[in-house]
C-alpha cells in the first residue's frame, strides 16, 4: 500500500498524480483510490490507468469514472465491464450497428438501483431483449433487461447478458426457443423515439417479431461503437430461416449531472459472417 493517507492523496494535483508509478497505482487501496480527484485521474496516462486492477476499477466512484477519457477507458481492456452495463440487443435491421453514445443516450434506471443514470442506448431500429417481470406493461429498470443486472435463480447477478439468458435454457440444449418454459415471457423493446420509456406499441413478443430461437453459443468481440463495447455476439433465427446478430453490448454510463465526454474509436462492423460456427 502507498504510505500516504487518503487526505494526502486527496490533495494531489493532476500533475502530481501523473507522476505516480504503475506499481504505486496498483498498490492503492479503496480509500486511497477514491480520494483521488477526478481531474487527477483524467490526467493520468493510459499506461497508468491500465495498471488499475479489476477490483480497483469497480471501486471507482461515479464521478471518477465519469472523468476518464475514452483512450483511458479503452486502455482498461476487459476491466471496463466494471464501468459498463450489458444488455442484449437484436440487430433487427441487420446493419451491424447497435447503439448510440452515452451523450446521445437516455436517462434510465439501468443498474436497478432506483436512480436514473445517463446511459448509452439501443438504436431506434434495433431491439432490447426484455421481460416484463412485474407485469405493468413497462420496462422499468435494468432488472428487466438481460445483462449484468439480471437476477439469476440463485439470487446472484449475472455477469453478462448471455449468462442471464442461459438461466432460461431449461433443457440445456444451448438454444432458447419454444421448448423452454419462459420463452413466452420474452419480448423485444424497440424504443422508436429513443426516450428510455416504454411507449404503446414498442413492446412485442418474439413470435410477433418472427423470431423463433436465440442461440447461446457466443464469441468475443473487440468492436467499439460510439464509446460502447460489443462484448459478445451470437445469433437469432427468424421464422423464414434467416439469421441476425444477437449481441451483448456494454453500454457506457455516467451520472446524470456528468459533463459530456467526447468518444473516440470505430466500430469493426459485426456482420452475419461474424457469427459463431453453427449459427
Go through the PLM ranges and name each one.
Residues 1-87, 105, 109-118, 158, ...:
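General marker for long, soluble alpha-helical cores
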Residues 80-279:
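Calcium-binding acidic motifs and repeat modules
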Amino acid at each position: 500500500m502507498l504510505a500516504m493517507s487518503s487526505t494526502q492523496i486527496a490533495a494531489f494535483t493532476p500533475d502530481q498524480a501523473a507522476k505516480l508509478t504503475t506499481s504505486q497505482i496498483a498498490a492503492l487501496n479503496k480509500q486511497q483510490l477514491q480520494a483521488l480527484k477526478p481531474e487527477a485521474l483524467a490526467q493520468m496516462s493510459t499506461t497508468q490507468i491500465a495498471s488499475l486492477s479489476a477490483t480497483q476499477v469497480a471501486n471507482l466512484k461515479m464521478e471518477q469514472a465519469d472523468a476518464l477519457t475514452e483512450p483511458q477507458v479503452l486502455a482498461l481492456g476487459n476491466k471496463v465491464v466494471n464501468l459498463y452495463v450489458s444488455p442484449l440487443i437484436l440487430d433487427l435491421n441487420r446493419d451491424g450497428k447497435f447503439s448510440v453514445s452515452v451523450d446521445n443516450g437516455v436517462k434510465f434506471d439501468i443498474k436497478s438501483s432506483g436512480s436514473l443514470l445517463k446511459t448509452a442506448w439501443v438504436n431506434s431500429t434495433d431491439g432490447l431483449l426484455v421481460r416484463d417481470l412485474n407485469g405493468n406493461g413497462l420496462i422499468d429498470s435494468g432488472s428487466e433487461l438481460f445483462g449484468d443486472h439480471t437476477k439469476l435463480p440463485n439470487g446472484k447477478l449475472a455477469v453478462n447478458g448471455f449468462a442471464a439468458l442461459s438461466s432460461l435454457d431449461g433443457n440445456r440444449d444451448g438454444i432458447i426457443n419454444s421448448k423452454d418454459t419462459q420463452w413466452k415471457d420474452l419480448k423485444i423493446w424497440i424504443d422508436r423515439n429513443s426516450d428510455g420509456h416504454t411507449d404503446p406499441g414498442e413492446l412485442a413478443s418474439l413470435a410477433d417479431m418472427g423470431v423463433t430461437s436465440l442461440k447461446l453459443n457466443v464469441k468475443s468481440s473487440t468492436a467499439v461503437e460510439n464509446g460502447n463495447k460489443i462484448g459478445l455476439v451470437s445469433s437469432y433465427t427468424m421464422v423464414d430461416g434467416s439469421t441476425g446478430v444477437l449481441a451483448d453490448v456494454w453500454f457506457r454510463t455516467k451520472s446524470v449531472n456528468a459533463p459530456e465526454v467526447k468518444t473516440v474509436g470505430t466500430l469493426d462492423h459485426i456482420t452475419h459472417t461474424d457469427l459463431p460456427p453453427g449459427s
